């Protein structure tokens, strides 16, 4: 059965920070700036052309043709060029049955998505994937009615079968500001995997692939490489960073990289290098 109340994980912040976006009940976070380091990869350079042949003939040309044939010319293939990752299939809010009457205010938007933070919901792992919509509906109710937020905190959900679900309203291809990583909501998108990955749960291959796919696509919309680093200015004291600190993070990071929490759980956090690598490969194969 679906989680009856989808309680928020104890390691997640229980309230939206005092510097939350205008869509949240509290005042906006201080102005945040981000500088990406390094920038999105540009196209690989093509192989340099060989140096030109000498224009002057040698002073003593050979009297006969050389006995050994000249080496045959072989074409070399240019390295693959990066491309924008394809948009994965995303289950819309309408399709998973979001109660839009719970959402009173319109979404707010970022200038750019510089990073993706990966989370877990810390709920049960013993669910059928057909129950995923009901679980997300329960989380929506909890985030609005208990946490006092305007909408879901996360921008996307992924279940163990690898299905991606739209989270906070505002447009999956838009830089919608969420409420998921205190101090860094002003730069990022949040992706949460249904289940608990701190207390024995292990992310499935399908879930890891889906997290990589949605992260690569979301970052790609903003010209951000999924295996890069980015420097973000902390907008609050997070237990890991102080207000104003310059935090250099992976563009696909775990919640614990920005905030003092166990989220996204030990096993999911340890899978992030693989997820980053998979996301990076997608920009050459999509």
Across the structure, where does each feature detected by a protein language model lie?
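Basic/polar, cationic surfaces and motifs that engage anionic cell-wall
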Residues: 3-6, 75-110, 115-117, 121, ...
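Cell wall/extracellular polymer interaction/catalysis modules
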Residues: 1-9, 13, 17, 21, ...
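Carboxylate/His-rich catalytic cores and anion/metal-binding grooves
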Residues: 150-151
């Amino acid at each position: 059965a679906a989680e009856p109340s989808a309680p928020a994980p104890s390691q997640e912040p229980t309230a939206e920070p005092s510097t939350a976006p205008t869509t949240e009940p509290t005042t906006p976070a201080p102005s945040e700036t981000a500088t990406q380091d390094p920038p999105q990869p540009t196209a690989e350079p093509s192989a340099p052309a060989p140096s030109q042949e000498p224009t002057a003939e040698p002073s003593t040309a050979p009297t006969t043709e050389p006995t050994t044939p000249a080496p045959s010319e072989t074409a070399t293939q240019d390295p693959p060029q990066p491309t924008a990752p394809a948009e994965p299939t995303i289950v819309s809010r309408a399709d998973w049955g979001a109660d839009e009457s719970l959402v009173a205010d319109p979404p707010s938007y970022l200038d750019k998505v510089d990073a993706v933070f990966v989370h877990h919901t810390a709920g049960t792992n013993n669910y059928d994937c057909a129950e995923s919509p009901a679980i997300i509906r329960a989380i929506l109710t909890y985030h609005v009615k208990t946490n006092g937020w305007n909408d879901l905190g996360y921008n996307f959900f992924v279940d163990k079968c690898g299905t991606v679900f739209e989270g906070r309203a505002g447009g999956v291809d838009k830089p919608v500001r969420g409420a998921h990583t205190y101090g860094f909501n002003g730069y990022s998108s949040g992706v949460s995997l249904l289940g608990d990955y701190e207390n024995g749960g292990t992310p499935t291959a399908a879930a890891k692939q889906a997290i990589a796919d949605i992260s690569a696509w979301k970052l790609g919309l903003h010209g951000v490489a999924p295996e890069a680093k980015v420097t973000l200015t902390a907008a609050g004291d997070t237990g890991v960073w102080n207000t104003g600190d310059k935090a250099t993070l992976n563009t696909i990071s775990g919640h614990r990289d920005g905030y003092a929490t166990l989220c996204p759980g030990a096993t999911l956090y340890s899978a992030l290098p693989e997820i980053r690598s998979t996301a990076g490969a997608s920009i050459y194969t999509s």
